[in-house]
Amino acid sequence: MSKKKLKNYDPTNLLSDIEKWPNPMFDKKHGYYLYVEGRARSNQTRKEHIVEYGHDLKVRDLELLPDGITNYFEYKKDPTYKNTYNYYLKRKGEDKGFVKVSIRINDKDPTYAWIKTVFITYKIK
């Protein structure tokens, strides 16, 4: 599987750069479609809506993401995986949780990154 690169990755501009992500990362008509690296796990407790896309790619359709998030987000280094960082985008409404976007930074060129996973969660780790 070829990885979809986020060229000139800048962690401070995630929200403003989101439309520049490779298609079909962003689709203005249908909302956000975000790649998951390899085969995604289905976990019903996360209340994910998962759809198929392409060969062995899984795509998660976060139907409320385009107008369902606030400008608030937290950015943390993943405690488990090397060169992986997590964004927690706050969803609108009380107790709606976060959209967690895990991004893997290229070891050799840190200006390149790719999406590993995207899902809805209620805890920041």
Feature names for model-found ranges:
Residues M1-K125:
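Ribonuclease/tRNase effector modules and their secretory precursors
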